[in-house]
Amino acid sequence: MKVAPSLLSADFMHLAKEIESVSNADFLHVDVMDGHYVPNLTMGPVILENVTQMSQVPLDVHLMVENASFFVELFAPLNPQIISIHAENEKHPHRVLQLIKSSGITPGIVLNPHTHEESIKYLLESVGLVLLMSVNPGFGGQKFLDLVLEKCLKVKELIKRYNPSCLLEVDGGVNDKNIFELQQAGVDVVVSGSYIFESKDRKLAIEGLQNVRQPLA
């Protein structure tokens, strides 16, 4: 399992130290919020540029914004590995995905918990990652929504049919209690914020998620 600690849960007063504490992660997950699509504001390109100078871990950028193409053009020069946009609020998602891809970045598509998985069927050939929100977007520290496990299975079947190389990622409430179920549901990458950053040994917490084991009965 690949693991992406969410910087939304980090202490920004000590960001360099926080990033070093999760340096064994596969990605760093960056939530960009504009205060319109979701009721919260987070980091912009200046902070993200600083992050790239602090770490060699690939960046996984999640745009929770309106007018995603504007933000893609802001963040693409920083060379994140992934930029994901929401399917729900884009009039022309294929156009934005192509913009991301033309920048040499893996495009991703995001679904909120209650958005039907069939809505992305015709976009799957244009993406390298599908991100399923397992909480309502906007704030960290929320409880995992179990209904997303069934959705993972359905999306994985769509991926197998339309784009087998596409990764499946889940974001929200991920911890050591549900990681095995997520792996069984076909998830390739998990985003975890509060669980990792509230752990005494963050590197060990990441390793525990990476090396998934069936929980004892």
Swiss-Prot record:
Q: What is its EC number?
A: 5.1.3.1
Q: InterPro entries of this UniProt entry? A: Aldolase_TIM, Ribul_P_3_epim, Ribul_P_3_epim-like, RibuloseP-bd_barrel
Q: Gene3D superfamilies in the record, alphabetically?
A: Aldolase class I
This protein's pathway: Carbohydrate degradation
Q: Where are the transmembrane segments?
A: none
Which GO biological-process labels does this protein carry? pentose catabolic process; pentose-phosphate shunt
Q: Name one GO molecular function term.
A: metal ion binding
Query: Where a divalent metal cation is bound, by residue?
Result: H29, D31, H62, D171
What are the names of the required cofactors?
Answer: a divalent metal cation
SUPFAM superfamilies named in the record: Ribulose-phoshate binding barrel (SSF51366)
Q: What class of enzyme is it?
A: isomerase
UniProt name for this protein: Ribulose-phosphate 3-epimerase
